[in-house]
Amino acid sequence: MAKQIVHGEESRQSILRGVNVLADAVKVTLGPKGRNVVIDKKFGSPLITKDGVTVAKEIELKDTLENMGAQMVKEVASKTSDIAGDGTTTATVLAQAIYREGVKNVAAGSNPMALKRGIDKAVTAVCGYNDAEGNRIPGALDKFSKPVTGEMIAQVGTISANNDETIGKIIAEAMKKVGKDGVITVEESKTMETQLEVVEGMQFDRGYLSPYFVTDPERMEAVLENPYILIHEKKVSSMKDLLPLLEQIAKGGRPLVIIAEDVEGEALATLVVNKLRGTLNVAAVKAPGFGDRRKAMLQDIAILTGGKAITEDLGIKLENVHMDDLGSAKKVTIDKDNTTIVEGKGKSSDIEGRVKEIRSQVEKTTSDYDREKLQERLAKLVGGVAVIKVGAATETEMKEKKARVEDAMHATRAAVEEGIVPGGGVALIRCVEAVDALKLTGDEGIGANIIKRALEEPLRQIVGNAGEEGAIVVGKIRDHKDPHYGYNAQTSEYVDLVKAGVIDPTKVTRTALQNAGSIAGLMLTTEALISEIPEEKKSEPAGGHGGGMGGMY
């Protein structure tokens, strides 16, 4: 396959055209008065969204050279979404502004490498950096950052959910209930209302092995108060292995929950018969997870309940298990799909040790899937799980609302983690002085000036989307000395943004600028593009006139 190669200014202009096509589609969604983008889907109804990364991911350009530019900016949005969970549109606007100004200066004779050095130094001055020991050195943005308290959590959620107060309040309530380590999941509701459900204690998605274990026929649940808990890695099929333990438990009169890979045959039949006779209040469930993850989850349950996970590694056989090896909890509730353990009797020091261990695994893992599963395990040990059930009148609205709730949830987590700064693009404008303080000269100075201009761009775009003149608003805010003074595009007023609840998570703003500066710098220092030459499809020749039967007209 032959390739086309484009050099110098032509390569940068091709990238710029691609960047502009993508960024112009994404940036209309920015701010409280941002517009919707409708995306055609091959199956089902069109998707209506105001989420920058969703729009960016849908864009593929016909021209292969321009498409390279679009894909690189798409990377800015995706990376920002992965790290901070929000700020994708801001990152796209910044990347476009930096690259557009940079291309002009390279065309005018500036050295691209010196420009990139200036851009990198300016971004570091604003965002800060980590030194060789991994300690965080704060940047100008950190000076305006404040920790999140009380009402602010709801305000961050509201802004990220495109000014939907209901979503903001529900997310704040969920964070309050499960804490910052708790897991918040988003599901589709069967009703039109958006509701919050909180599962206290540890829950896993395995139900009872037989409906005969049910103690509350009305709710079809098995509720066992103050039970012993046997945690076993393998299948339990022979009754003789279990008998010594069951006899000891039956004497004490307390219920028993068995968590094992499976309980089948003779063992299951005997347990059911004893339950029905009233000899022993018992319930059996399958162990959660698969493979190594199952082993880890059983260990979590053991630590939470103060028991031992009977695994092959320990070398303990089921017939040799003592009462001391069993865990216990205040209550275990089992329905056909889920098991919930409330107030396990494990030692708090053991639980804290396990939590630390899982936290370090979360930091080390490179897989998003593994990280999500580890965080779920962490939440089950520490706080519990909150489920936000999103309701809407139509499926199209449901999808759009669910995406907004997920965005708002990520933004709120980021705010709790690193604090908040004044929103509406104002925090970035306040960092211009830090770039001036670098006193860079020559082409590096031009690179720093590119960042100074780009820092104003999100505010210009927010104001432009609200139907006002961006340059006037930027000038007025720049001249005002109060760092919290800014423009509330929702009400078209100049206010103290923090008091008005117009705030952004520091992490989101910082990540957006870092990623935009990184990719724009790479694109500026590009001197050649190589891509496949698109094949021209030959049109099929028209078919001849079909012959007819004799006597036909």
From Swiss-Prot:
Together with its co-chaperonin GroES, plays an essential role in assisting protein folding. The GroEL-GroES system forms a nano-cage that allows encapsulation of the non-native substrate proteins and provides a physical environment optimized to promote and accelerate protein folding. PANTHER family: 60 KDA HEAT SHOCK PROTEIN, MITOCHONDRIAL. It is found in: Cytoplasm. One of its GO terms (molecular function) is ATP binding. Belongs to the chaperonin (HSP60) family. This is Chaperonin GroEL. GO terms for cellular component: cytoplasm. Gene3D superfamilies: GroEL, GroEL-like equatorial domain, TCP-1-like chaperonin intermediate domain. ATP binds at T29, L30, G31, P32, K50, D86, G87, T88, T89, T90, G424, D504.
